[in-house]
Amino acid sequence: MENGAARTVPAVIVAIDGPSGTGKSSTSKAVAAKLGLSYLDTGAQYRAITWWMVSNGIDITDPTAIAAVAGKPEIISGTDPSAPTITVDGTDVAAPIRTQEVTSKVSAVSAVPEVRTRITELQRSLATSAENGIVVEGRDIGTTVLPDADLKIFLTASPEARAARRSGELKGADVNSTREALLKRDAADSSRKTSPLAKADDAVEVDTSDLTLQQVIECVVTLVEEKRAAK
């Protein structure tokens, strides 16, 4: 009976938003794996298209130039939470999209409406085709990409906590410079005209500053299970 019950668990779409360094990726992957859901890192998609722009010599300061080629690269995301993948035109870009160069330019590329339209279409397609449900993490998932998501979560944390976490992820970055970069990124993401970083009105806010990763995961898993039980 248990196996039969497991198969009939309703699919659930979970949107997890928040700025960098709040634990979005670690939390989203763990929650998806624990609950048997697919997982999508939307930030990686924006990093991937930014990497492609840089690699092809596109002027990142020229929105018109970016818009003209936004549809060119083929970006494919693997949604297995235990081994998420991302390729651009068949090339594995999981490592190169995490460099400081890409990190410093992703906001400019992401702000171009044609880029957001292209990536948003990819995200919606992946979310609607996930048979068992999916955890989608990003900055505008609950507000723009999947406004009808079953559950919306907005993670926050103090700038200090975020910088400490982020400096451990990015090569060659110290905490102080990382903190400044994060605050600059926040300002850019929150003020852009197209799909700014924002908390959805119906999102559950979770401050991760003083929580361990495991505590955050348990909190989100509980929220998802409650939502799934109510469907």
Curated annotation (Swiss-Prot):
Superkingdom assignment: Bacteria
NCBIfam families with a match to the protein in the record: cmk (TIGR00017)
Enzyme Commission numbers on file: 2.7.4.25
Annotated residues for binding of ATP: 18-26
InterPro entries: Cytidylate_kin, Cytidylate_kinase_dom, P-loop_NTPase
Annotated GO biological process: nucleobase-containing small molecule interconversion; pyrimidine nucleotide metabolic process
This protein's name: Cytidylate kinase
Subcellular localization(s) per the UniProt record: Cytoplasm
GO cellular component: cytosol
Example of a GO MF term: dCMP kinase activity
Catalytic activity: CMP + ATP = CDP + ADP; dCMP + ATP = dCDP + ADP
Family: Belongs to the cytidylate kinase family. Type 1 subfamily.
SUPFAM superfamilies: P-loop containing nucleoside triphosphate hydrolases
Gene that produces this protein: cmk
Record keywords, A-Z: ATP-binding, Cytoplasm, Kinase, Nucleotide-binding, Transferase
